[in-house]
Amino acid sequence: MRDAVLPGGGWWHLGLHCRAWRVAQQRKRPAGRHGVAQILRGGCRPQRASATGGNVEAAPRIAMVAGETSGDMIAAPLITALRKRLPRASFVGIGGPRMQVAGMESWYPMETLAVRGYAEAVRSVPQILAIRRELARRLLASPPDLFVGVDAPDFNLGLEVRLRRAGIPVVHYVSPSLWAWRGERIHLVKRAVDKMLALFPFEQRIYEQAGIPVAYVGHPLADEIEPVPDREGAREQMRIKPEVPVIALLPGSRRGELEQHAGLFVETAKLVAGQVPGVRFLVPLTSRATRLQFEEAQYRHDARDLPLTILFGHAQVAMGAADVVLVASGTATLEAALLRRPMVITYRVPRLTWHLMWPRRRLPYVGLPNILTGEFVVPELLQDDATPANLAQALVNALRDKFVRERQ
């Protein structure tokens, strides 16, 4: 088990890194708030006639594919920004609810692509491959003026190779984690994209060294989240008194993640509730399916009386109101860091997936705050270390540390 208590000043250290990262984004990002949109509007290749016979600038048709909630969250503001600059643009492909609200026509349910790991993927491979074949057929039959693959590299890169070979300009938004594992994918990326849009500054160097056109555009969360989070406002919104200890539980957005984490998080909450009088738990979930999974876990683990509120979305409000966050590794760890919330990062996958993936890792940590700082500033309890007892102790320690600091 990794140390569950951070060394003195750990959270402050993370805060400094987050502040420095915000400044770096402001300095290096293309001019204007929507730098990504400007890059896309500028194009990757010489301007050409639209597939529909008109001028690309007049009415471009842009295809996009996002494969999970984090991609939906990142791509929706991009669509909004592009529509402001190109009012007649149309957007098609695969996207989630935010992208659809922003004006995209989604041809397939995004949730179908939201799988992670070998064991989970095996069950879904036939359906995912069928969708990719049909999507490629539709896009090649009626070529868009631009294709933007949003994360989801296992789905998008293969599709992008086919589209680029057919002369369709391709941009990939959100770099695959080449720096963490499967670095050999850089060769596939080189065949697949005209330009990579990187969220983090260290990723830009990787692509420049490989001769792949790249732009560091920053992470949209750094614009979205206020530099000084409003804890009191978040608590008022949740109708929680200032003195109540609150823990936000974020078990993930995929159904596969809930299969691994729902029971674990419920058992952890039960242990914490037995040690921290008056504690409240907030659980933001992204879909009815994941909400049902979590509620079923409450019943299975006899935890219906837990002081727990399930929210539909509102993850940032839940984390903003919390004293400590228990979070599955992913984009939510970056949100918690930008909100300056102490957190414990955890993750579980099926045992086969773990044994196949873990030996191929390049870094000793998985959480974005630790990757960005280059050291363990946030505790990670993964796989066999991710037990209810270990997680509960880490959360209780983090709560006690917070209250001690506030009294000093």
Where are these regions (language model features)?
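An anion-binding loop in the catalytic cleft
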Residues: 1-53
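Nucleotide-activated sugar donor-binding and catalytic core shared by glycosyltransferases
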Residues: 52-408
